[in-house]
Amino acid sequence: MSYSPPELISVDWGTSSLRAYLADADGAALAEIAADKGALSLQQGEHEPYLASLLRDWKTRHPHLPVVASGMVGARQGWVEAPYASCPAGLAEIAAATVIAPSASLGGVRIVPGVSARDARGAPDVMRGEETQVLGALAAERRGEGIFVLPGTHSKWARVEGGRIIGFETYMTGEAFAALKDHTVLGRMMAPAVDPTEQTGFGLGVDAAAELERPGDLLHAAFMARTFGLFGQLPPDQLAEYLSGLLVGAEILAGARGVKSATVIGAPALVERYRRAGAILGVELTPAPANCATLGQIAVLKGAAGAAE
């Protein structure tokens, strides 16, 4: 059995959690650390000692390995701010905008910047962490164009041409679902799913999204998550599924803009949910490799090294 030596320590440090990987040159994880302290939960001065304590064993065994971090760790409220790179932004622009966070024990941590864009009205949009995943997907698939979907609390739909992110939109799908379910009248009749394979409610919600015609129709269709329960048209455990399908379906219809295929990047369960909704709506969503963040960080590290030569 061949041994792949570690090439870097990859850190995906978001708002509420952290994952670190001891990775080889192909982005495969040789070891993994998960922690529940997000970048925004720490005060200034706490990030470096916290990360150093998590990575101490790896750095003791591999003292010269570079450490690359992406996500909210580079936000203004994070460890060290890595200002947004403006679209269009590809590997060269993102690698050139990385920032080194000082750390004697870690040898400095290279932080990947986020990316900013403006829509047709001039309204700004931002992402942090997703740009690294997009770069990783591009490297894995060896192509330089396409639509990339990154579902989550704040889902992103990124458009790539010539290897550069030329624009993207954020949809508050995950956060809107949680808020409506947990803090409005819609959640009062909802119950946890009994059978994870039961898709009646989810499919009904996606179908409802496909029928939306006017901007306010989504708000009307959302209220059906209550009335379907009141009149027994859906069991309690399918009401949240209906709401999820409605919001995910509305996002896909808005984000796809008539495009019939895209690449989806994210956690397997969420990717599968989007893939199912896309199939109902005629949009083929193909999953990207699970290690896109690490692959993107490898590309950024190489790009930064090349720029320095």
Predicted feature residues:
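Glycine-rich phosphate-binding loop plus the immediately following alpha-helix
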Residues: 42, 115-212
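Short beta-strand-loop/turn "lid" adjacent to the catalytic site in phosphate-handling enzymes
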Residues: 58-124, 162
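Adenine-nucleotide phosphate-binding core of ATP-dependent small-molecule kinases
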Residues: 211-250
